[in-house]
Amino acid sequence: MAFSPYDRERILITGGAGFLGSHLCDRLLADGNYVICLDNYFTGQRRNILHLLENNYFEVIRHDLVNPIFLEVDQIYNLACPASPVHYQYNPVKTTKTSVMGAINMLGLAKRVKAKILQASTSEVYGDPTVHPQVESYWGNVSTTGPRACYDEGKRCAETLFFDYYRQNKVNIRVVRIFNTYGPRMHPSDGRVISNFIIQALRGKPITIFGDGRQTRSFCYVDDMVTGMIRMMDGQDDFVGPLNLGNPEECSMLELAQQVITLTGSESQLEFLPAPPDDPRRRRPDISLAKERFHWEPTTNLAEGLQRTIDYFKELLSGT
């Protein structure tokens, strides 16, 4: 189907050169939109969007979200912020500023141009939860002073700003809480468990497990996550969130490590290290609301998604 340039929605994606943002760029372009990718390349990577640079309906702007920017757009997906402990703890002050000032700047832009805006929040707003699985009405159990607080509290403050702009200024917002997401284009040195395990297995190195390995996470494949985000953005204005997006299938770190070893054919052994402070023991979303409102749930099983991710890292490590 051919799209006239005048029929295309102009969509801004902050953090668009990152893992999740680049997949969102792909999908929104395929859907016939004009996409503006904004990134400062702190964790985003140009190689994630190289295949899009010749597309006449794709634009890249190098910009730091802590500074305002003036554009004419119809929709804004606000993804920009380091999302792994290795990256967000490297410069915790900058992490908090990116979440808070970035939200202020993007909400100000949305208010000015009357754009619809989606905040990519996080399951980290639940902290180390005492409620399991986590529902959107749960307020969380979060340390305000721990080493993860720069990310957790920054995202919580961003949510507050979104709802205040919605109530006070009638900005058309959406808020999604994203649980652990994985897939091709994950940063190889971001310290996330799936990328760590895969790279260690492919290199035949010990697979490092922090703690006893019985702590759990739920892992959602990136294509499923992108679908959920777009459905939320395009949904009716009578529901603005927050909305959990994630895979309700729970997996322990020991189970994940064994599955990665099996799929890679690796002979890696397990190595246990002390658990980091404030590391949640369990994390699993209740996605009843996403099912009810948007008929959304993940369709990619863990083995299938891991295999695609392993294939990506094999190619990356081989230099091809």
Q: For each of these PLM feature ranges, what is it?
A:
Residues 132-133, 188-196:
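A glycine/serine/threonine-rich, flexible loop-to-helix segment
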Residues 150, 158, 190, 253, ...:
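Conserved donor sugar-nucleotide recognition element shared by glycan-biosynthetic enzymes
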